[in-house]
Amino acid sequence: MIKSELVQRIAEHNPHLYQRDVENIVNAILDEIVAALARGDRVELRGFGAFSVKHRPARAGRNPRTGAHVPVDQKSVPFFKTGKEMRERLNRDNPEGAAADDADD
């Protein structure tokens, strides 16, 4: 599901809201999550999961084409850890662990 599909779904489930308002709300939430991570904060949504930033140290990499060693700078990467309720629901709804079918979208 992409962001526009998420906005459309939320708007369909909330007919009292205009789709453009739902889009503004979704964008505001995502912007605030990104801003918090950029400040170094952790964002926890109980039952859903937690967003945080992991710092990867500089390391020596290798160009796969030439085999030459190249330095890879340190970097910060986003990290998401699922919440307990989400894990339980995913395992309850899908006990075999197989990918969900897109037919129900």
Curated annotation (Swiss-Prot):
GO CC annotations on file: chromosome; cytosol
Sections of the chain in a coiled coil: none
Residues annotated as transmembrane: none
Keywords noted in UniProt: DNA recombination, DNA-binding, Transcription, Transcription regulation, Translation regulation
CDD domains from the UniProt entry: IHF_B
UniProt superkingdom: Bacteria
One MF annotation (Gene Ontology) recorded for this entry: DNA binding
Protein's name in the database: Integration host factor subunit beta
Family the UniProt entry places it in: Belongs to the bacterial histone-like protein family.
GO biological process: DNA recombination; regulation of DNA-templated transcription; regulation of translation
Quaternary structure annotation from Swiss-Prot or TrEMBL: Heterodimer of an alpha and a beta chain.
SMART domains, per the entry: BHL (SM00411)
